[in-house]
Amino acid sequence: MTAGVSRRALLIGGAFCVSTISRSIAATRVEIEQFDANGVSTGVAALDKIVKSDAEWRAQLSPRAYDVMRHEGTERAFAGPYWDDHADGLYRCLGCETALFDSKTKFDSGTGWPSFYAPASKHNVVETVDSSFGIRRTAVSCARCDAHLGHVFTDGPRPTGLRYCINGVALSFAPRGAKETAR
């Protein structure tokens, strides 16, 4: 009977380990909608999550971008890039170049931050509850590298009524039709 219990425990333990490893491997992949240089979707692909050490992020990002993207900081209003930019193209994550917002959804919110009424794809952003500073908000981050981008509010224009208030320092801009960078 002892051998039966041991075998059962071994099988259960082994199944648990396989299940845990499978979930862990799945958590390292994420579905990202990809866009060509003209902003046209080329489909959704399962891509590896971008995971870097703190030292690697510090080396890649400016101090201000590092604070915003890795520690949920906020740039000063009217001080960051893109708040008053009207060029046609895609706004991408500075950390991993994932397409986040299209200039076609950008609007002047008067807040001093780049504002959009919709992301380029719901696959490419993650929204989570942020209760810091004693207020309940919805934080927005990049789905591929977990970079903090900003917050989304329900005071935006039609057609969504949403305002994605994004830190410009967390973005890069690719003019529509520009040759894509590989990353």
Report each predicted region and the residues it spans.
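N-terminal secretory signal peptides and thylakoid transit peptides that target proteins
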Residues: 1-17
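Short charge-dense sequence patches
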Residues: 7-11, 40-48, 93-95
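Compositionally biased, intrinsically disordered low-complexity segments
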Residues: 8, 21-24, 35, 128, ...
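C-terminal segment of N-terminal export signals and the immediately downstream linker at the start
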Residues: 21-60
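A short Gly-Trp-Pro
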Residues: 38, 49-52, 58-60, 68-92, ...
